[in-house]
A protein has these predicted regions:
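A broad, structural surface signal
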Residues: 8, 12-26, 62, 66, ...
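N-terminal entrance/gating region of PLP-dependent enzymes' catalytic architecture
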Residues: 1-135
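Active-site phosphate-binding strand-loop segment of PLP-dependent enzymes
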Residues: 213-266
Length: 271
């Protein structure tokens, strides 16, 4: 049994959706930036139990316009100034359309060679654009929070304590410390907690009048921890904090991390 419509029905529905998207981009400033609904207004328009029968695409698009759109905050709106100062692009929308159609997984080269090789090439372009050394490489993750998590996991293993193999309990290990600005993203705390560092070992470094991490305060915290038997493990610097878009002094922080043999992660997901 085929659940999808025939090609002609799909093509007509896709054209209607693209027409709506094009009009939306062109007329987005006609919408209020913030929705004007009250809590529960959207949910009340839908049945409490899922329907056992589907609906045609044109009916779904009508429901989207009439029921969903009124409850949307328009992040692409020219007068939207909250949170992240970036908007979606038309090219990005089409790219996601093609990606959704392919429905491919790129966890290995074999699962989709094009995904792996395009990822590698795109990161080379980014590396060269930033003027970074030619021996640098990387991977693209789904969120900056995952990047922070993986960086802290790498930092934990770089201590040489083989925590991945032997765990953090049942043997005599020093407490590993993670340092970040008091304005760092919450993913630092969440990642450190998930990886077993413990809340008391997440050290928030004081900021200056520009809300940037103070390198001298970082150096003092690391020195104090070493004197008290803790093992400094990782430093997270932020370029564009969520609260104020502050940029930590990465060079000075990096010099301290290098001197103290701490893993340095730069959370460069601006805001």
């Amino acid at each position: 049994m085929k659940l999808d419509p025939n090609a002609d029905e799909f093509r007509a529905a896709a054209h209607a959706a693209v027409d709506w998207i094009a009009d939306y981009f062109q007329n987005i400033d006609s919408f209020p930036v913030l929705s004007r609904v009250q809590p529960g207004d959207i949910a009340r328009q839908f049945a409490t139990a899922a329907s056992e029968e589907g609906k045609p695409y044109d009916a779904l698009l009508t429901e989207f316009r009439d029921k969903i759109l009124p409850g949307i905050t328009h992040w692409n709106h020219p007068s939207f100034f909250a949170y992240f100062s970036i908007t979606g692009s038309q090219a990005g929308v089409l790219g996601e359309l093609l990606t959704a159609a392919l429905n491919a997984n790129g966890m290995l080269w074999k699962t989709s060679p094009s995904l792996t090789e395009l990822e590698t090439r795109a990161l080379q372009w980014l590396r060269d654009a930033l003027g970074l050394p030619s021996n640098l490489f990387g991977i693209i993750n789904d969120t900056a929070s995952v990047n922070v998590f993986l960086a802290l996991a790498a930092a934990r293993e770089a201590t040489g304590l083989n925590i991945r193999g032997e765990g953090m309990t049942g043997r005599d290990l020093p407490a590993l410390r993670v340092y970040c600005s008091e304005h760092a993203h919450s993913s630092v705390d969440k990642g450190a907690l998930a990886l077993g560092f413990g809340a008391k070992n997440i050290i928030k470094i004081a900021s200056d009048e520009e809300f940037c991490m103070r390198p001298e305060a970082l150096a003092e915290a690391i020195a104090s921890d070493r004197a008290n038997g803790f093992l400094p493990c990782a430093v997270v610097a932020t370029t564009g904090t969520t609260s104020t878009a502050a940029v930590d002094p990465v060079r000075a922080i990096g010099e301290i991390a290098q001197r103290e043999k701490c893993w340095l992660h730069v959370d460069a997901a601006y805001a």
